[in-house]
């Protein structure tokens, strides 16, 4: 699996940048992580290895994620079976050789809300909590120079490797690391994304400070998180679960979140989108058969969660490191 992580290419990509030293330390760090592994990792990685060798002649990452080429019915069936071995698929959708992975989330809808506000051309990007890498591929489609994603979830890594197997030359890497496992004050990325992470953090201000420390001077943060209505004094701390999630800590209002970003030292703070998540955007599918948003909302009132709290609403904020 270490070979699939493609660290030699990552080190070459980061040579001569502030991230060069960190890149040189990654093989040892990831070797240690792989030694610990996960009970299902062999099965998931086996699904990746079961993918048929197929030539890719068409790639689309700008308008959607899709690639294809010559593929007979037997190979397509083998491809679908291997990809089903990586269920549940949460972020997407993906289209490979005519196989459509209808993921739990319509992540392309979120990307349509975020992308118009960004200029990623030639940027060196870090995606914190990157999941299976869907957004990283779309960042490349928007012109990014290189994208590094971190997420400690092994299933998400294998889902990413399934795509990278067919697109090995793309400058995108998924590292099975938590944000806390990165060195402090990397100060090496032009743009840092944190989408769907902040509300899982017990100390959200510290998270914002750590994100700032990963950026170069003048670098840009793209922050997406759950919010509530209200003024700068309004922050929701759930008593227990929120939309059936246990690990949700702070849901600020947009004005409160803007204040947090300014207190963390960011400038040019602006909110570019606020959207309530619909049951069309997050739902169970053939590729994710567990409970989803429809089960997490009050069946009589979709403006509330089953706990009686405001239904999930997400804001996208952009800020600059001075």
Curated annotation (Swiss-Prot):
Documented EC number(s): 2.5.1.-
Protein keywords: Transferase, tRNA processing
InterPro entries hit by this protein: CmoB, Mo5U34_MeTrfas-like, SAM-dependent_MTases_sf
Pfam family, one: Methyltransf_9
Primary enzyme class: transferase
Claim: ATP-binding is one of the keywords in the record: no
Record's catalysed reaction(s): carboxy-S-adenosyl-L-methionine + 5-hydroxyuridine(34) in tRNA = 5-carboxymethoxyuridine(34) in tRNA + S-adenosyl-L-homocysteine + H(+)
Keyword Transferase: yes
NCBIfam families in alphabetical order: PRK15068.1, tRNA 5-methoxyuridine(34)/uridine 5-oxyacetic acid(34) synthase CmoB
Family per record: Belongs to the class I-like SAM-binding methyltransferase superfamily. CmoB family.
Subunit structure, interactors included: Homotetramer.
Protein name from the UniProt record: tRNA U34 carboxymethyltransferase
Organism this protein belongs to: Ectopseudomonas mendocina (strain ymp) (Pseudomonas mendocina)
Lineage of producing organism: Bacteria, Pseudomonadati, Pseudomonadota, Gammaproteobacteria, Pseudomonadales
């Amino acid at each position: 699996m270490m070979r699939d992580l493609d660290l030699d290419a990552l080190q070459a990509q980061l040579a001569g940048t502030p991230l060069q030293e960190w890149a040189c330390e990654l093989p040892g760090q990831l070797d240690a992580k792989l030694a610990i592994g996960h009970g299902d990792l062999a099965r998931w990685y086996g699904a990746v290895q079961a993918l048929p060798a197929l030539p890719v002649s068409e790639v689309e990452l700008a308008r959607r994620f899709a690639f294809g080429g010559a593929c007979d019915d037997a190979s397509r069936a083998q491809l679908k079976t291997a990809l089903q071995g990586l269920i549940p698929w949460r972020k997407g959708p993906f289209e490979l050789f005519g196989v459509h992975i209808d993921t739990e989330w319509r992540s392309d809808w979120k990307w349509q809300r975020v992308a118009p506000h960004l200029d990623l051309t030639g940027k060196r990007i870090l995606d914190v909590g990157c999941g299976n890498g869907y957004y990283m591929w779309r960042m490349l489609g928007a012109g990014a120079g290189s994208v590094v994603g971190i997420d400690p979830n092994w299933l998400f890594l294998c889902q990413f490797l399934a795509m990278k197997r067919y697109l090995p030359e793309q400058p995108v890497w998924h590292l099975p690391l938590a944000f806390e496992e990165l060195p402090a004050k990397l100060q090496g990325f032009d743009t840092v994304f944190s989408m769907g992470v902040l509300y899982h953090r017990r100390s959200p201000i510290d998270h914002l400070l750590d994100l700032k420390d990963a950026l170069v001077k003048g670098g840009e943060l793209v922050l997406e998180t759950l919010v509530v209505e209200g003024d700068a004094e309004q922050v929701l701390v759930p008593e227990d679960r929120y939309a059936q999630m246990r690990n949700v800590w702070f849901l600020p209002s947009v004005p409160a979140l803007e204040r947090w970003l300014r207190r963390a030292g960011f400038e040019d703070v602006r909110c570019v989108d606020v959207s309530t998540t619909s049951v069309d955007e997050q739902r169970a599918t053939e590729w994710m058969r567990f409970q989803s948003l429809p089960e997490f909302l009050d069946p009589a009132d979709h403006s509330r969660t089953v706990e009686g709290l405001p239904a999930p609403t997400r804001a996208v904020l952009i800020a600059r490191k001075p």
